[in-house]
C-alpha cells in the first residue's frame, strides 16, 4: 500500500501540472472503487485547480467550489501524460487538463477512492487523524505521552492513524530498526530517550524515502511512470532470511495484526 512518502511523491509530481490549469472534463471508465466515484467528479467541467495538498495518505485537490479527495488504496498510482495514450485495463480515471496534460489514475485492485466534499473539515475520512509525522507537533515528548499507558506492541501502535498518520507497514518496520527497538516491545516500555530517538528516525526515514521517490515493491509508480527507489535502501522490510546489513544476523519475519513485520533479533531490543 502506498504510504506517506509515496503519496507525497505523487503530490509533488502532479502539482506543477495541475495548479493554474483547468480541468476540462473527467473521464471515468470504472467508478466502482472502494467507494463509488462521487457524482460531482463526473460533472467536472472547466474547473481550475487551485492547489494540490496532502493530509495523511490522502491527496487533496482544491477547486473553487470544493475538494477532490484521492486515496491510492492498495495498488493505486497517478501519472501525468502529455498525450491521450490508450487506456489499459486498470486505468480507471482521467482528468483532462487545459494545458494538454492528463492526470491518469491506475488501480489494479480498485481499493482506492475519488471523493468530493464542499468542506474538508469534518469529512469522515479526514476526521480523528493524528498529527503529521513531519510536523513539529510530532516529537519525542508527544510520543512519550501517547505511549505511556499503551499496553500494546509498538509496531502496530505506530501504524494507528490516531497516533500519527502515514507511517504504514514499511516505514514502521524500517524506523524501529533504525531506532534499535524490537517491534514486540510494549509501547509503554519505551524510555524518554527511546521516544526521542524514534520520533527523530521516523522523520529521517520518511524524508529519505521522499527524496528517493518512495518505495516501489509492486504497483506504485511516480507521476512520471518511474518506480520509487527507496526499495533499494530497505534495511529489514521484505528481507526475511537475508543477512542484516549491520550485523549479519538473518532478518526475521512475524505478523502483527495480520501485517508482516521484519526485524533483526540482534540489533533490536
Swiss-Prot record:
Its gene is: mutM
Mention one GO molecular function. Answer: 8-oxo-7,8-dihydroguanine DNA N-glycosylase activity
Q: Which domain of life is it from?
A: Bacteria
Q: What is this protein called?
A: Formamidopyrimidine-DNA glycosylase
> What's the catalysed reaction?
Hydrolysis of DNA containing ring-opened 7-methylguanine residues, releasing 2,6-diamino-4-hydroxy-5-(N-methyl)formamidopyrimidine; 2'-deoxyribonucleotide-(2'-deoxyribose 5'-phosphate)-2'-deoxyribonucleotide-DNA = a 3'-end 2'-deoxyribonucleotide-(2,3-dehydro-2,3-deoxyribose 5'-phosphate)-DNA + a 5'-end 5'-phospho-2'-deoxyribonucleoside-DNA + H(+)
Q: Do you know which Pfam families this protein is assigned to? A: Fapy_DNA_glyco, H2TH, zf-FPG_IleRS
Gene3D superfamilies according to UniProt = 1.10.8.50, MutM-like, N-terminal
PROSITE patterns for this protein: FPG_CAT, ZF_FPG_1, ZF_FPG_2
Concerning its family, UniProt says: Belongs to the FPG family.
**What is said about its interaction partners and assembly?**
Monomer.
Q: Which NCBIfam families match?
A: fpg, PRK01103.1
- The residues listed in the UniProt record as binding DNA, with positions renumbered to this chain, are 90, 109, 150
A biological process term (GO) from this entry:
base-excision repair
Q: What does this protein do?
A: Involved in base excision repair of DNA damaged by oxidation or by mutagenic agents. Acts as a DNA glycosylase that recognizes and removes damaged bases. Has a preference for oxidized purines, such as 7,8-dihydro-8-oxoguanine (8-oxoG). Has AP (apurinic/apyrimidinic) lyase activity and introduces nicks in the DNA strand. Cleaves the DNA backbone by beta-delta elimination to generate a single-strand break at the site of the removed base with both 3'- and 5'-phosphates.
Q: Could you tell me which PANTHER family the record lists for this protein?
A: FORMAMIDOPYRIMIDINE-DNA GLYCOSYLASE
InterPro entries given in the database record: DNA_glyclase/AP_lyase_DNA-bd, DNA_glyclase_Znf_dom_DNA_BS, Formamido-pyr_DNA_Glyclase, FPG_cat, MutM-like_N-ter, Ribosomal_uS13-like_H2TH, Znf_DNA_glyclase/AP_lyase, Znf_FPG/IleRS
Name the UniProt key words of this record, in alphabetical order.
Answer: DNA damage, DNA repair, DNA-binding, Glycosidase, Hydrolase, Lyase, Metal-binding, Multifunctional enzyme, Zinc, Zinc-finger
Where are zinc fingers of the kind FPG-type found along the chain? 235-269
Q: Write out the catalytic residues in the record.
A: 2 (schiff-base intermediate with dna), 3 (proton donor), 57 (proton donor), 259 (proton donor)
